[in-house]
Amino acid sequence: MKYAKTLQAALIARLGNKVEFMPGWDKQRRVPWQPNGVPVALLFHHTAGAATESTNSKHPGNQKGANRGVINFVQNHYEVPAANFTLDRDGTVYVHSAFPVWHAGKGSFKGVKPFDTLGIPKDMGNDYMLGVEVVSKGRKRDFTHAQKVSLGKLANACKDASGWKGFWKRLPNHRTWTSRKVDTRYSLTALRSWATLYR
């Protein structure tokens, strides 16, 4: 349970009032983090469902609570949450679990540099990587500015809590893990740039 407390402190320090902890977030529902009790990366997903794909901060679909149904689905639809975090369009990060959940599915980083150096066995991504679901329809690059800022801060909080030295091999897309997926629509360079820019 030590990692949960460390992660909580890091998230609050980085995100302030833009983080909310869901019921049971600190409960270990599956195995501990592999291989050494902390995750080795943060895997990026999009929900493929959202109230809007407008990036206008004043749009009703980008206000807090507008996508509560999506957040509740990630939290409650399966036996364990479908991601560790959901990032709403207003920039709020909802923490579902500090421990391994089911989000990565089958896949492999074999031959995929630099992620092949993480040592994640085939189809075992759930036990090694945190996952964040970004609320987005996923048809185009529609992340809001608030989401990009919070993604950067979330990545830094995960780095702080997990002891990563940097971001080069720590922020893969879901499609980096498996060719079955298209998320996210953003490049690895973009993801890394937000982590560097928004701390």
Residue positions per predicted region:
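N-terminal catalytic cores of peptidoglycan-degrading enzymes
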Residues: 1-123
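Basic/polar, cationic surfaces and motifs that engage anionic cell-wall
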Residues: 1-23, 32-36, 123-131, 135-199
